[in-house]
């Protein structure tokens, strides 16, 4: 007679569902986060009881802290999203792993290049927006800053979520600030193919878009 109720199978099934929900959460943010953020801000502005909060948020986020994405992002104490347990389930879904091949001197600053971009850069998020793959344990004293397009910081509320994951702007000034002004160990991760490479994403095919994207090499040389 077959065992109908198997605790191990049930636990595995529940864990797998949680993993799928973690990935779905990130995918939904990518697809609908911009619309949701704008709609939420409009709702707050139109409501007389929350209007002042919306105005204060706009002033704080887009005036007082408008340069934060290009100035190293949030300090580590405010990088709340990086500490979420969600990233463990997110990475286990695929699974996503990081493999250490050498030690890195924490006295230096580094430019890491990530490939492939894929459609949404899911691997980069899993490795560098949280600690699920053990980056800080493998490279103590190295502080990773995943970089993305500056336009992604124009979306209300999603902007704060992104900054709380330790993400910064990928513009030249931002990279130079992190490498030269934030101290030893602060390093950047550039998805070198960018949005152009995302358009080349196909199942079973990995293409590197690099020919017209060599600015990071110049930055590496100029910052020694």
Task: Kindly label every feature range from the protein language model.
Residues 8-62:
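Alpha-helical bilayer-embedded segments of polytopic membrane proteins, i.e.
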Residues 53-55, 69-80:
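Interhelical loop segments of eukaryotic multi-pass membrane proteins
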Residues 60-73, 176-181:
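Short secondary-structure boundary segments
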Residues 12, 69, 105-106:
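FNR-like FAD-binding dehydrogenase module
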Residues 9, 64, 88-91:
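Short, isolated positions within intrinsically disordered regulatory regions of eukaryotic proteins
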Residues 78, 82-85, 89-224:
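Soluble catalytic domains of membrane acyltransferases
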Residues 5, 60, 84-87:
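A residue-identity detector for tryptophan
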Residues 1-8:
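Short, charged cytosolic
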